[in-house]
Amino acid sequence: MACPALGLEVLQPLQPEPPPEPAFAEAQKWIEQVTGRSFGDKDFRTGLENGILLCELLNAIKPGLVKKINRLPTPIAGLDNTILFLRGCKELGLKESQLFDPSDLQDTSNRVTVKNLDYSRKLKNVLVTIYWLGKAANSCASYGGTTLNLKEFEGLLAQMRKETDDIDSPKRSIRDSGYIDCWDSERSDSLSPPRHGRDDSFDSLDSFGSRSRQTPSPDVVLRGSSDGRGSDSESDLPHRKLPDVKKDDMSARRTSHGEPKSAVPFNQYLPNKSNQTAYVPAPLRKKKAEREEFRKSWSTATSPLGGERPFRYGPRTPVSDDAESTSMFDMRCEEEAAVLPHSRARQEQLQLINNQLREEDDKWQDDLARWKSRRRSASQDLIKKEEERKKMEKLMSGEDGTSERRKSIKTYREIVQEKERRERELHEAYKNARSQEEAEGILQQYIERFTISEAVLERLEMPKILERSHSTEPNVSSFPNDPSPMKYLRQQSLPPPKFTATVETTIARTSVPESIASAGTGSPSKIITPNTVPMLTPRPYSQPKNSQEVLKTFKVDGKVSMNGEMAPGDEEGKEKEGPAAAAPGPSLTKSQMFEGVATVHDSPVQVKQGSNSIEINIKKPNSAPQELTAASEETESNGQEDEDGEERPGTGDLEPDSAEPQHFTTTVTRCSPTVALVEFSSNPQLKNEVPEQGQKKPEDEMSGKVELVLSQKVAKPKSPEPEATLTFPFLDKMPETNQLHLPNPSSQADSPSSEKSPGSTPFKFWAWDPEEERRRQEKWQQEQERLLQERYQKEQDKLKEEWEKAQKEVEEEERRYYEEERKIIEDTVVPFTISSSSADQLSTSLSVTEGSGTRNKMDLENCPDKENERRQKTPFQENDGDSLLKTREGGLPEEQSLTPSPSANPEISVSKGIHQDPQLEAEAGAPHCGTNPQPAQDPPRNQQIPNPPTSTSEDVKPKTLALEKTINHQMESPGERRKSISGKKLCSSCGLTLGKGAAMIIETLNLYFHIQCFRCGICKGQLGDAVSGTDVRIRNGLLNCTDCYMRSRSAGQPTTL
């Protein structure tokens, strides 16, 4: 703390004294030995600047004193470490006045105003702290390393004593008993406790050195927040007064008199009862402080002593316990001594120095404030995230009440609305698909992600029938008006029928008068040039312009029909709908011409049966539309199932009552009901059968939309020559009626199309091979059956193994139980005999059991065959608990008296060989024959459960004698009878019996767990070991801890309805 007496020797230029080399060398050597690290080519200040060596020195003296060392190569990191070092020194017992300032180690080479003298003084402050730390380490019990040689510091101490003598004023008196004694006594007397004393209200506002390092006064905090700077207790503020040499010098503080302090409390600037009017707001305080600084700078400059302030507002209290060594403000530069105190040049020089110091300090404070604001913002972000996480946990666990909890849980209406929205999006994407692969990918992706109402459909692979359904059913693509669009998806995901084929069509023109062609129809009468157009051209995913209106809900004769089930009149009802949708517009392309739905303009449908072809006539009625009754009259089918997938043709029964019919011929090959419902046998020998023998396949119930529609239900013909009439709206607009020709390969020569006009032009177009398609469908179905069979077999084997394992464990449990009972009976001293009274008691209890077991009797009589088989398989059953059954079915009365009552001892009466858990029975599909599984709470488990079909043999071990059983019944208390009920249950996780240990039972869901098996199904964490209870959620049959449940909720995994 070298400080020359500027006030006494103002005319002599000061030369910086060389630092005491022995003290530097000893301090450096001691630090290197203790820490094991070398300074290298760095000097003393540079080696200690980052504070890492100092912190490691403290940890070597007392391990764990500095928890975290900041090793970043920044000045702020060094300041952090230095502050941690000074804090650790306090914990070792060093006092405030023995510590250097954190800024004493900063690099001041680039500062203009800091001279060599100030640099030397700061290093001496560091050496003094090392000296006291060495003394503390020598007395520390946990330190056993190298001791600091205190003799090397004698030169430093003597030099500081000399400086103290020079700087001291004549008014002060110090004892001459030695520097160290004076130092220690003064420190222990007036310097050691940080008393937070202040001068008068003007001086002490900014005398930051008088404050405690850890508890800055309120005005600093207020000013730090109002300036935008952090309130920092390690470095000074820019509004600080110019230093007082006598007051601020470290050695002067150590030797100053302990004058009486004013009894001003620490929080004197906070409003309280005693000084409510003395509180000065922070902005006013700052202005006063600034005015006071200028006043003090002038008074200090003109003072004869350089440090004594002549103007005081109140009684002066010297602040001798200043916690700082105030790095940049303590010393005036040596040039000040050469200037006369009263000259104007000296005043200007002082003002210049003051401004430079302010600028440097402002820059330092700005850097520090930026760094602190960065750290503060990062901390606030962390705190905010933590609060959000806790709030989310409270919300999910329901601690904030049900109202907030309900906000995070969707209602059923919201779930349904979201499901409908997903389905609409799926329909749009599916409708806009450009290729078959893309459409199948969209559908498969939806099925994998969401359930389609039936859980079975989730696992079904999509059959490749989309191409056929779109090439022959273009009306199914009109999703938006469909009231229940999911029906189409269900239909698409069902296995396709075995036999399918398409319709090959050609159209030939014939000369018919134009007036007749357009008579009696409601379609637009614009004339179109006749074209020959291919019908049913396979454009799988295109859609006509107006086909959106085709698919609507329809009702025929009071029956509402759904897509999957074709009721009578459905096809006619569909044909009545939307004629404008199927009618092509004025500018029709070839593909649009026949992609509409073939609809009927309220005209009757009749079929004319030929030997190898069917003739469909078109009649355009001039009268009002008639009500169709052909499809609504249902005839009795003979109940046969058409194994070949062929349908006999149905016939209509209505004669048209007006206009001359215009004929066109159709020949239809064999078709699948899912492709078109106009289905006729392609075998010539079947063509001649009676039309009433229309067979209805089961697959027809699953068939979807239709294209060329005839009724599925057939009606008996009322006329000898039935005739079908269809009105095609796209024929109405043509001047000449086109011939619709559907060639049959086997009967092409017999087709009546040869009788038509020679101008008919047949068209060749693409058609898939029905035989190849049939083979593919059969192969697919066989593969599915094989996979199902394998899966079923695996499940059966697994169930069999689990059942046998459970049987063995139950038998082992019962065997041990009876061994214990036998030992207890053998150890009993009281002799037991079977008396007549005991026999009577047994028979009475048996009759009570019979009365309570009537339901068991009824159940067992329902399946006597199985009981006979079971008795033949298990010859040892008389030792088990089915003696009741033997009694009912004519067992010997002697066995009654020796067989224990099932109600008396449920553990004994439960049959060993035939017991099975109800869950296992349900999985194995064992027929129960009306037997109800016994609930877990029912103590008398005397119900006889039949064997599952997978069991081969039971290994039933013989039990103890009936005498011992009888004795056991008489001794047993009702409390003992219930103790092993859970032992018969199987763990839902590992499949083993629960036994007698701790178990977790959720009876409402039929879930049973060993306490060690009660784990989260996702993270496998233990759920049953919490002291304060466990929050368990069961999601899709799987145990979920709170963390995994919240994670799955935030990931958005859907819960099935």
UniProtKB/Swiss-Prot annotation:
One of its GO terms (cellular component) is cytoplasm. The modification Phosphoserine is found at residues 169, 177, 192, 201, 204, 207, 217, 226, 231, 233, 297, 303, 377, 471, 518, 523, 603, 672, 719, 751, 757, 760, 973. Keywords: Coiled coil, Cytoplasm, Cytoskeleton, LIM domain, Metal-binding, Phosphoprotein, Zinc. One of its GO terms (molecular function) is myosin II head/neck binding. CDD domains: CH_LIMCH1 (cd21278), LIM (cd08368). One of its GO terms (biological process) is positive regulation of stress fiber assembly. Residues 354-439, 782-823 form a coiled coil. Residues 229-260, 382-412, 694-704, 856-872 have a biased composition (Basic and acidic residues). The modification Phosphothreonine is found at residues 215, 402, 472, 529, 537, 725, 899. PROSITE patterns: CH, LIM_DOMAIN_1, LIM_DOMAIN_2. It is found in: Cytoplasm, Cytoskeleton, Stress fiber. Residues 21-128 form the Calponin-homology (CH) domain. The modification Phosphotyrosine is found at residue 313. Residues 633-646 have a biased composition (Acidic residues). Residues 185-326, 373-412, 468-493, 514-769, 795-817, 833-910, 923-957 are annotated as: Disordered. Residues 269-278, 472-481, 514-534, 606-615, 663-672, 736-760, 896-908, 931-953 have a biased composition (Polar residues). Residues 985-1051 form the LIM zinc-binding domain. Residues 204-213, 835-847 have a biased composition (Low complexity). Residues 251-641 are annotated as: Mediates interaction with MYH9. Interacts with MYH9; independently of the integration of MYH9 into the myosin complex. Actin stress fibers-associated protein that activates non-muscle myosin IIa. Activates the non-muscle myosin IIa complex by promoting the phosphorylation of its regulatory subunit MRLC/MYL9. Through the activation of non-muscle myosin IIa, positively regulates actin stress fibers assembly and stabilizes focal adhesions. It therefore negatively regulates cell spreading and cell migration. PANTHER family: LIM AND CALPONIN HOMOLOGY DOMAINS-CONTAINING PROTEIN 1 (PTHR15551:SF3), LIM DOMAIN ONLY 7 (PTHR15551). Belongs to the LIMCH1 family. This is LIM and calponin homology domains-containing protein 1. It comes from Mus musculus. The gene is Limch1.
